């Protein structure tokens, strides 16, 4: 579980009357902004651990993101902004294997114990790639990807790439980051990436377990996901085709008939 902290950084900065140099981990992070980011991230991590406890779930804050300074870009020192070097996947797999949810903040660490501000969308992508995740789910405050006032329910990654190339200006800054990282995830063999509104009650359940979902699903080449059917799939196949059979769109087949053709 990867969380951001931009909103909390803005809130903490207002309380201290400090103007942050950057809030999302993509621009310059000066020393005072880094300290605010550490404070805000720690607060969010703690709140998540509290909520996990309410559901009788175990979680652990981690330093699994190994980073190094982003350095100088176009002559400008990015100071305490970091670039993700790698993910300590062994640590994450150890926790997950013991039913402990790794809670990962938008902070990276180097071998000298220095802390860097990193972008949470990039962290989530790096973790998904490292763990070879089946899904990457971005939870935001928007319904998903919207074009011409219409929510896009599903989109192949190649179509999204085309829109990012030709219509980047139509994306809001928040949507653009999610879309770019979702597309990269699919290119790196994460089969699906979701962008959903976290303000919708039980939205995550609806996205994962309903046919329609509530947000936008980005998927890799669907033909790469096809595999031969197995006998254990028969019940699912019968359930999937029930509606089409009732509408006379498909011929009714018995379990034995399907099994014979597998």
Predicted regions span which residues?
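Nucleotide/pyrophosphate-binding catalytic subdomain
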Residues: 1-195, 199, 227-236, 241-248, ...
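Terminal amphipathic helices with adjacent charged low-complexity linkers/tails
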Residues: 7-9, 200-204, 210-213, 221
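Conserved N-terminal entry element of GNAT/NAT acetyltransferase domains
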Residues: 209-231
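Conserved beta-hairpin
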Residues: 260-262
């Amino acid at each position: 579980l990867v969380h951001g902290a931009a909103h909390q950084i803005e809130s903490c900065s207002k309380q201290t009357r400090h103007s942050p140099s950057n809030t999302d981990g993509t621009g310059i992070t000066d020393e005072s902004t880094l300290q605010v980011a550490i404070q805000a991230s720690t607060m969010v991590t703690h709140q998540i651990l509290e909520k996990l406890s309410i559901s009788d779930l175990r979680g652990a804050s981690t330093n699994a993101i190994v980073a190094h300074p982003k350095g100088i870009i176009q002559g400008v020192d990015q100071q305490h902004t970091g670039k993700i070097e790698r993910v300590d996947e062994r640590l994450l797999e150890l926790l997950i294997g013991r039913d402990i949810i790794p809670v990962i903040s938008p902070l990276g660490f180097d071998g000298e114990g220095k802390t860097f501000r990193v972008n949470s969308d990039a962290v989530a992508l790096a973790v998904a790639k490292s763990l070879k995740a089946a899904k990457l789910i971005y939870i935001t405050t928007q319904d998903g990807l919207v074009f011409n006032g219409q929510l896009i329910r599903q989109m192949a990654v190649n179509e999204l790439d085309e829109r990012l190339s030709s219509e980047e200006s139509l994306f809001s800054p928040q949507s653009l980051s999610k879309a770019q990282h979702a597309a990269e995830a699919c290119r790196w063999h994460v089969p699906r990436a979701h962008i959903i509104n976290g303000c919708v009650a039980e939205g995550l359940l609806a996205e994962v377990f309903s046919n329609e979902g509530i947000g936008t699903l980005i998927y890799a080449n669907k033909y790469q996901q096809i595999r031969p059917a197995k006998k254990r799939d028969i019940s699912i196949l019968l359930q999937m085709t029930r509606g089409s059979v009732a509408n006379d769109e498909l011929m009714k087949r018995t379990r034995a008939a399907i099994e014979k053709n597998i």
